[in-house]
Design a protein with these regions (language model features):
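Transmembrane alpha-helical segments of multi-pass small-molecule transport proteins
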Residues: 36, 136-162, 179-186, 396-412, ...
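Membrane-water interface regions at transmembrane-helix termini and the short interhelical loops
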Residues: 136, 154-177, 183, 187-196, ...
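Extracellular loop-to-transmembrane helix junctions
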Residues: 27, 54-79, 94-105, 147-148, ...
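Hydrophobic transmembrane alpha-helices that form the core helical bundles
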Residues: 87, 103-138, 149-153, 369-387, ...
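C-terminal membrane-solvent junction of multi-pass transporters and transport-like membrane proteins
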Residues: 173-176, 382, 386, 392, ...
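Hydrophobic alpha-helical segments and their helix-loop junctions in multi-pass secondary transporters
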Residues: 180-225, 243-251, 493-507, 533-542
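Membrane-interface "cap" regions at the ends of multi-pass membrane proteins
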Residues: 1-49, 264, 271-284, 291, ...
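Flexible loop linkers connecting adjacent transmembrane helices
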Residues: 11-17, 51-56, 78-102, 126-137, ...
Length: 543
């Protein structure tokens, strides 16, 4: 493989040609099943458990007809994320660097913002365990939650470090979480007469699409609409799926699942229990021979199927949680926020089914949320590893200069958002320096991919444990929820450029790897939808 790197780290683009090998033989769907359900499991952590039930409990069924539309729009986004990896064995972030390095580094900054407040991901799961166990005894609730947050972070680190293959760890955890959440909530619905009694009205609402008269691709808001809930609605739209940056994990899971040309690329394996696998700095393409095209089409059809499975699995989970909220919370006029949605329903189940009912509901909430830390740490570690291993390696010679440039770039995006929380601001000053130093040092000293990955995953967990004891930066948390909608629009636009224009020019198979016109149009529609939603939110907030 050609390793000479001539392009400028800022003003050039990733231009190393692909290695060329035949398309990997398709082994059957059962052998590669995984990325779709991982995506579904991740998606269940916020929109499905928190935001959609909140909207239903407060506004009834006003928005439900829009939910399947927003869910299906995630399909085209995922499909093109997976297509690039299927054709090249590279992550989509490598593709963004092939568009241009400046664009690649902008996308990297978006990712760092999204994963900056890592301590919060275990908060709700820890709250569930505190409510169930009341452990440690004698401690106040806040201290108990912090204890469980630290413990869950340590458990997360140990599982990932000792799991032989990082992807398999995430796959198992997310699959268990997705199945427990899906069937647990379905069982809760079926076991509750009050919920079943409103089933007819609930499902009839899917046929009542209330359209914004000014912008038909946006929903009309109800008469009692609270403008402050605009951010909730936008977040619900984005998280009718994983959302924004989170969706890009699908590209990595396709890669480590050995799909298509990724079968020629090694996986991330544990330095403690796994055997090292070679991970090249650039991907592997194929020529347009009849045999290769036949195999390629099998992989693409499987990508469609796997992606559809994840979208539908996630969509029906939203149906169960929204139905439960409509049957229990809405009639009582209860509109609790965040984790309170589950605890309130847990108390209702305690009245109906006794203490076991409350515990079951809290356990379901735990399964919804515990898995997020695994996937967040895995995804951020992969993104950092890609930029250090592919973007910096072989292109930088000075650690101080590289650290300074990286630090300034990241600080511009992150530090202003943490103003108002002095201790957190101080932590981020140090954190961004360590990230920059780790990336520069690993690139110059030729670290292997997995060494970068596990080093950053460890840093991710350490920072998460520290953040538990700090004041959360409200500006950052609010910004990330809205930023993800903008990122979804930006990344969809990037995929239109990458897969329709750039990929056919640099791939030996040319137009054979380009999406069809139908796919292009559907992704274009999705992109317009995300841009309109972003603009609408800005307009509403500015008055």
């Amino acid at each position: 493989m050609a390793e000479e790197k001539k392009s400028h780290i800022i003003f050039g683009r990733l231009d190393i040609p692909f290695e060329v090998k035949d398309v990997a033989k398709f082994p059957g769907y059962a052998a590669v099943f995984g990325p779709g359900i991982i995506w579904a499991g991740l998606s269940q952590g916020s929109g499905e458990l928190i935001w959609w039930p909140y909207l239903v409990s407060k506004y009834g069924l006003w928005f439900m007809a829009w939910m399947p539309i927003w869910a299906i729009l995630q399909w085209w986004y995922n499909q093109e994320l997976g297509r690039y990896t299927l054709a090249t064995g590279e992550s989509v972030y490598d593709g963004f660097m092939r568009i241009h390095f400046i664009w690649g580094w902008v996308c990297f900054a978006f990712a760092v913002i999204m994963f900056s407040w890592v301590g919060g991901y275990q908060g709700a799961a820890a709250s569930a365990m505190t409510a169930i166990t009341k452990f440690p005894p004698g401690w106040d609730t806040k201290s108990q939650v912090r204890f469980w947050m630290v413990l869950l972070n340590i458990i997360t680190w140990l599982i990932v470090m000792f799991g032989p293959v990082a992807y398999r760890v995430v796959e198992v955890i997310e699959t268990l979480a997705a199945i427990a959440s899906f069937f647990g909530m379905l069982a809760a619905v079926l076991a509750t007469p009050e919920v079943l009694a409103v089933g007819g009205k609930f499902f009839a609402s899917f046929l009542s699409l209330k359209v914004n008269p000014a912008i038909p691709i946006l929903p009309k808001v109800p008469p009692n609409w609270d403008v402050a809930d605009t951010a909730v609605l936008i977040t619900s739209i984005t998280y009718t799926g994983a959302g924004g940056i989170w969706n890009t994990g699908y590209s990595f899971w396709v890669r480590d699942g050995n799909w298509g040309q990724a079968a020629h690329v090694g996986r991330v394996t544990s330095p403690l229990t796994g055997k090292p696998e070679a991970i090249p700095s650039v991907g592997v393409a194929f020529e347009a021979t009849p045999e290769n095209i036949a195999e390629w089409k099998k992989w693409v059809r499987t990508l469609w199927l796997d992606n559809l499975f994840g979208v539908l699995f996630n969509m029906f989970t939203i149906v169960w949680t929204a139905w439960l909220s409509y049957g229990i919370l809405h009639p009582a006029g209860l509109t609790p926020k965040g984790w309170q949605l589950v605890t309130v329903q847990g108390e209702w189940f305690a009245k109906a089914f006794g203490e076991p009912g409350r515990i079951v509901m809290l356990l379901l909430g735990f399964f919804f949320l515990f898995d997020i830390q695994f996937t967040a740490g895995d995804l951020m570690s992969r993104i950092v590893s890609d930029y250090a291993y592919v973007g910096l390696k072989g292109r930088v010679k000075s650690i101080p200069k590289t650290v300074i440039l990286m630090y300034i770039w990241l600080a511009i995006f992150i530090l202003p958002l943490s103003i108002g929380a002095p201790a957190t601001f101080a932590l981020y000053v140090v954190y961004l320096f360590v990230v920059s130093l780790l990336m520069a040092y690993s690139a110059i000293h030729d670290w292997e991919y997995r060494k970068i990955y596990y080093s950053f995953f460890t840093l991710f967990i350490i920072v998460g444990c520290i953040q538990i004891f700090l004041k959360s930066p409200a500006t950052l948390i609010l910004s990330t929820g809205i930023l993800n909608m903008a990122v979804q629009a930006i990344f969809c636009t990037s995929l239109l450029v990458l897969n329709w224009y750039v990929l056919p020019k640099i791939h030996p198979a040319g137009k054979e790897v380009r999406p069809s016109w139908i796919t292009f149009i559907l992704l274009l529609f999705s992109t317009i939808m995300w841009w309109y939603c972003t603009a609408w939110y800005i307009q509403v907030r500015l008055g």
